[in-house]
């Protein structure tokens, strides 16, 4: 892509983003991607739509390939914005100093975040919530060691027969989803306020 094409693409993306924001504010269309989990630092759906120019830099720099582009099924106005795809990779920002997506964003659609003394995100920075499908879980324990906040509970916790997730501790990083060996995964990741995530689904 040459400079002229890049400028044209950027202009078109900005125009679509601006139109989307106006439609949301006018109440013509909804702005929520019902099942999408956004990258760390996306604290307002409208902010993302206002500022994201869909340049793809955050997706390109993600070291675990956790980010991908939202498609039309995720919501027409969200098409092209970054979302988390934990089956490709989980977000490691709670494990180590990595906010590459934030650093790469040229428009501050992804805002800077406070970190601990090792550069990691704190446990109370939540982007989603994981839930184990008890009917599909094979109790392999792969999810347990990769969880950065000790949110995985072993079988027997609250009389459950499979591994489960303590939703009060889960940051929604998706590392457990990535680690799950079950075809199609036995763990789902939801937005933090998604009602489908509560209570734990039982087999």
Predicted feature descriptions by range:
Residues 1-203:
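Non-ligating segments of multi-cofactor redox enzymes
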């Amino acid at each position: 892509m040459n400079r002229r094409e890049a400028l044209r693409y950027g202009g078109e993306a900005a125009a679509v983003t601006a139109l989307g924001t106006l439609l949301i504010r006018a109440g013509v269309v909804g702005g929520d991607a019902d099942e999408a989990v956004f990258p760390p630092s996306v604290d307002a759906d409208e902010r993302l739509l206002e500022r994201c120019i869909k340049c793809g830099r955050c997706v390109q720099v993600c070291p675990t390939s956790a980010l991908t582009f939202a498609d039309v099924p995720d919501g027409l106005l969200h098409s092209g914005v970054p979302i988390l795809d934990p089956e490709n990779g989980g977000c490691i920002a709670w494990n180590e100093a990595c906010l590459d997506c934030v650093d790469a964003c040229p428009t501050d659609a992804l805002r800077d975040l406070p970190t601990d003394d090792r550069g990691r995100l704190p446990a109370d920075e939540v982007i989603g919530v994981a839930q184990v499908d008890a009917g599909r879980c094979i109790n392999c324990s792969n999810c347990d060691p990769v969880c950065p906040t000790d949110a995985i509970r072993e079988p027997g916790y609250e009389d459950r027969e499979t591994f489960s997730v303590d939703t009060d501790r889960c940051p929604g990083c998706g590392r457990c989803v990535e680690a799950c060996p079950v075809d199609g995964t036995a763990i789902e990741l939801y937005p933090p306020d998604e009602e489908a995530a509560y209570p734990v689904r039982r087999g």
